[in-house]
């Protein structure tokens, strides 16, 4: 049977701290401890499940492998790069309290075969891929429907029989003091069926481990944290039950030039002192190629220019963001003597009473400093 997501087992988020994980473990371990639930096989199973989840999520190496590859990353018998493992996005509480209160969502009738687990695949994209969209081939390790037994778990020509202990319910009732509690049937392990002659291919599970390749269309404009759901592409369900879903989790690598914020892109463009003072045109990179940007005379370093429609097209609407270019004036380096002399001459022309009109910000700054010291000494 497929394992539940470890974070779900402990009822914590994927960003939970080690302290939060330990706190959740202590609470659940106390709840399901065998000493507090004598003879309760369901509680014993839950206790083992909680303990296993805790051991994985508090070991930094195992946790990193699990976060990247899911159960495949911590199970030596399974593997698959980029694969995110089981991630059951269903109702946590139905699973936790189901055995105690008569099967939770399953109701009081015959035990239904479990739906397949949801899967998660971590997909890393470049900024260009995320902005423009593309089709990706993904190789997914999963549990697939066994073709040999057609998912029944029984050898061809035979069929599962109804469990005589629970009469197909998958649960038995036990009394603990004043309370009557239900737990998984110890004979059929909650399945409601007994397979006397199991299939040689799946060993009675009705599912086999396989890898499948999917062609997934990534829409233009996706961003970090976006999740694409592929219905029915998760693990096969138990004994013919519906399959789970596949969730493709998108992350976008940092770009060497651009920073994305929503649908807008930001970049810094270096300009020379002469270009900033006299104005002119500069080349600016965009995701569609270079474009010219007109710089007015007397442009100060840090000024932001907006190029409308040069950002990212929204994945959820027809809106297109802008490209915001911040110009940064560079101080020239490795000057020869002639260049230094010219700069000295230029600097001298700015000195004196006329310097204020050439450096309005400097004038305001030094006037403020002068007033500060006057107030300090008064």
UniProtKB/Swiss-Prot annotation:
Keywords: Chaperone, Cytoplasm, DNA replication, Metal-binding, Repeat, Stress response, Zinc, Zinc-finger. Its cofactor is Zn(2+). Residues 5-70 form the J domain. Signal peptide: none annotated. One of its GO terms (cellular component) is cytoplasm. The keyword Cytoplasm applies. Homodimer. Belongs to the DnaJ family. This is Chaperone protein DnaJ. It comes from Shewanella woodyi (strain ATCC 51908 / MS32). The gene is dnaJ.
């Amino acid at each position: 049977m497929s394992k539940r997501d470890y974070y779900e087992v402990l009822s914590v988020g994927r960003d939970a701290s080690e302290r939060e994980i330990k706190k959740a473990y202590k609470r659940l371990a106390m709840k399901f401890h065998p000493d507090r639930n004598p003879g309760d096989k369901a509680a014993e199973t839950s206790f083992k499940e909680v303990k296993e989840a805790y051991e994985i999520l508090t070991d930094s190496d195992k946790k990193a492998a699990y976060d990247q590859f899911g159960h495949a990353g911590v199970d030596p018998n399974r593997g698959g790069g980029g694969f995110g493992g089981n991630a059951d996005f269903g109702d946590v509480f139905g699973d936790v309290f189901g055995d105690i209160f008569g099967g939770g969502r399953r109701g009081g009738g015959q035990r239904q075969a479990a739906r397949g687990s949801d899967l998660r695949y971590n997909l890393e994209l470049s900024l260009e891929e995320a902005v423009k969209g593309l089709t990706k081939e993904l190789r997914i390790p999963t549990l697939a429907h066994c073709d040999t037994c057609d998912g029944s778990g029984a050898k061809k020509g035979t069929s599962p029989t109804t469990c005589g202990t629970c009469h197909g319910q998958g649960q038995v009732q036990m009394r603990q003091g004043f309370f009557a509690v239900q737990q998984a049937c110890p004979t059929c392990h909650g399945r409601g069926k007994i397979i006397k002659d199991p299939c040689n291919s799946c060993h009675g599970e009705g599912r086999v481990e396989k890898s499948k390749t999917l062609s997934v269309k990534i829409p233009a404009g996706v961003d970090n944290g976006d999740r694409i759901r592929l219905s029915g592409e998760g693990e096969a369900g138990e004994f013919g039950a519906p399959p789970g879903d596949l969730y493709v989790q998108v992350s976008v690598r940092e770009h060497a030039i651009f920073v994305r914020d929503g649908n807008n892109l930001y970049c810094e463009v270096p300009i020379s002192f002469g270009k900033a003072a006299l104005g002119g045109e500069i080349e600016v990179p965009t995701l569609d190629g270079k474009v010219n940007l007109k710089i007015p005379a007397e442009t100060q370093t840090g000024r932001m220019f907006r190029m409308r429609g040069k950002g990212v097209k929204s994945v959820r609407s027809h809106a297109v963001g802008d490209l915001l270019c911040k110009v940064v004036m560079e101080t020239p380096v490795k000057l020869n003597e002639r260049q230094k002399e010219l700069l000295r001459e230029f600097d001298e022309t700015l000195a004196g009473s006329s310097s204020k009109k050439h450096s309005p910000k400097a004038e305001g700054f030094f006037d403020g400093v002068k007033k500060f010291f006057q107030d300090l000494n008064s």
